[in-house]
Amino acid sequence: MLKREMNIADYDAELWQAMEQEKVRQEEHIELIASENYTSPRVMQAQGSQLTNKYAEGYPGKRYYGGCEYVDVVEQLAIDRAKELFGADYANVQPHSGSQANFAVYTALLQPGDTVLGMNLAQGGHLTHGSPVNFSGKLYNIIPYGIDESGKIDYDDMAKQAQEHKPKMIIGGFSAYSGIVDWAKMREIADSIGAYLFVDMAHVAGLIAAGVYPNPVPHAHVVTTTTHKTLAGPRGGLILAKGGSEELYKKLNSAVFPSAQGGPLMHVIAAKAVALKEAMEPEFKVYQQQVAKNAKAMVEVFLNRGYKVVSGGTENHLFLLDLVDKNLTGKEADAALGRANITVNKNSVPNDPKSPFVTSGIRIGSPAVTRRGFKEAEVKELAGWMCDVLDNINDEAVIERVKGKVLDICARFPVYA
């Protein structure tokens, strides 16, 4: 018999210590990785529920196992909320991750060897949009598009590449692009050659849900997203579509199960349902508006301190600092800021002379600090501290002084009060 009072601390001290240390790290470090965020206790409650015990291969009302009457309710809630939130008429909430969701879309719509037009990873794209080290780059003939000299997506080049190579699919979406994407223009280019438009909106899903960033769902044939990042839910994936055929939706469902996955993670799907409900609340819109304001406020400080920001600004939650002119590598900047309890990630910049393991830039995002309650005043102060560290990257006294300020502001703005 399993006793409810069982706990990790009394059973596995070594593991518990690591978990507790991570909890402290999250409270005492400022998180600026653009893809990270903090889930609500409600989301974590769902993930730690008894739903983790239930196998439920199939879809609501069409399961391969008995005893699914309640998990059917859970999954249908998640499906209905996803459709309502993003204005879709199809949703699949089962993908275990954004990459799994993307894989399912490729499986449903393409054959190995088909030509695909995707954003260059070095200019803001994502691994699953055609990187040669990823399944997408191994299975398909990838033609990259990129950005122009101003740092904006080059739609003329995209249209030219589309006409020349006649891809079966064009991918919209990014992991390190700070501008507004013209989804309608992308659909126009796709329609001109009879291609699918597939949008991966993982990074901006929360902003889109709140009406702060344009929604691709009315324009794309298929859309995927993660449920964490700006959406602030559990780690997982989601597929959406609007105006498609039942045949398309059946292909997408089959590409998730049974093609790519077996049993869905019902505890995670419950957590997705919670997060989607939270994203419908008025305070979520206020939060996302502040995310965008905070990113702009940080950019202003970096520019005033003489740092180069790729594309000159941001229209979403993230931006890239180009450190080439400062003779700094992303790896060095990442490490120095980390010693000051400020977490970022090194990131390649356009025409980067360094390898992806070193890079010449860092990516900065505002979702997590905004979740803590930071507003413009706090993020401007934070950006100034970051400049102090980068200006004095080998001065441990400066780094320690900034670390003290970070610990103080983290205590004033706890993640979980």
UniProtKB/Swiss-Prot annotation:
Homodimer. Pathway: One-carbon metabolism; tetrahydrofolate interconversion; Amino-acid biosynthesis; glycine biosynthesis; glycine from L-serine: step 1/1. The record marks H228 as: Plays an important role in substrate specificity. This is Serine hydroxymethyltransferase. GO terms for biological process: glycine biosynthetic process from serine; tetrahydrofolate interconversion. Catalyzes the reversible interconversion of serine and glycine with tetrahydrofolate (THF) serving as the one-carbon carrier. This reaction serves as the major source of one-carbon groups required for the biosynthesis of purines, thymidylate, methionine, and other important biomolecules. Also exhibits THF-independent aldolase activity toward beta-hydroxyamino acids, producing glycine and aldehydes, via a retro-aldol mechanism. GO terms for molecular function: glycine hydroxymethyltransferase activity; pyridoxal phosphate binding. Belongs to the SHMT family. It comes from the Bacteria. It catalyses: (6R)-5,10-methylene-5,6,7,8-tetrahydrofolate + glycine + H2O = (6S)-5,6,7,8-tetrahydrofolate + L-serine. Pfam families: SHMT (PF00464). (6S)-5,6,7,8-tetrahydrofolate binds at L121, G125, H126, L127, S355, P356, F357. Keywords: Amino-acid biosynthesis, Cytoplasm, One-carbon metabolism, Pyridoxal phosphate, Transferase. Its cofactor is pyridoxal 5'-phosphate. One of its GO terms (cellular component) is cytosol. Its main location: cytoplasm. It is found in: Cytoplasm. SUPFAM superfamilies: PLP-dependent transferases (SSF53383). The modification N6-(pyridoxal phosphate)lysine is found at K229. InterPro entries: PyrdxlP-dep_Trfase, PyrdxlP-dep_Trfase_major, PyrdxlP-dep_Trfase_small, Ser_HO-MeTrfase, Ser_HO-MeTrfase-like, Ser_HO-MeTrfase_PLP_BS, SHMT-like_dom. Its EC number is 2.1.2.1. Disulfide bonds: none annotated.
